[in-house]
Amino acid sequence: MVNQSLEQALELSLFLPFAVFRNPFTFIYTQTYPLPSPSTIVGILQKSLNRFDLYDKWKKHEIDVSVKGNYQSVFTHYVRKIKGELYFDNSILNKVSRDKEPEILLNSDRKPVFEQEIYSLELLIHIKTDQQLLEELYKKLSKPQSIISVGRAENIAFYLREPKFVDIQENASDQESVTLKYSTYAKPSHLKDSEKYLSLSFLEVSYAKDKDLYYSVFAGVDRPVPSQIERFYKLNFLEKGQEFFLKDLQGVEFLKIENELEPIFWINYED
């Protein structure tokens, strides 16, 4: 029997009736990521504490997050996009200026867009950081002062279970393999053969209120316009039911769910 080294993490179990985590690389047919990005989760934590230094802590590897979830289906619906400004007569128009000519008003841009949306999403989120910060997050998230939304405001979340502390172990005892109970994100470095699994690209944007304060791309709070594209990065998406031999996993910890071990793929900021 392998000796187990245990540490605590904060667990959030959320239900979203509908959700869109828009892939910024898609346009006329806008697609959704299957789960929220890690920075989206950091944004929820920032909003709960009403402070904006957690993103920097995540960048410094002082906070790790794990994003898991299962959903019932993904459907596509039709959206009519209208771009313009509302004027006194309730018409929607665009201002257009040309070289050395006065501004003129033209009809607004209108175009059809197809958009993916997730139906009936259950999220299982884990956060690992220092004990004091975990206690602060637990206190605030146990009694939220406002509606919890994951990413965009329409992605309203409800607790399936109250936030709680769980024990995370470094080893998987004497097991040779594990089967995922939840779909999850993993870093390519977690997997021996990461090229075998679906790879998704993410875009990270920094928001600067002043030179010392930065906001997460999905902070979910009032914030200034993006100041710069910070980085592109890739994560693997692993689906529920996939089996993995432990020898093919690297830097992974484990959680007991219904007396069975579930791998936890910690995601932190990597330059």
Residue ranges of model-derived segments:
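General N-terminal targeting signals
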Residues: 27-31, 38, 52, 58, ...
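Active-site helix-to-loop segments that bind/position phosphate- or nucleotide-bearing substrates
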Residues: 52, 58-70
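Extracellular structured ligand-interaction cores
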Residues: 7-9, 62-64, 120-124
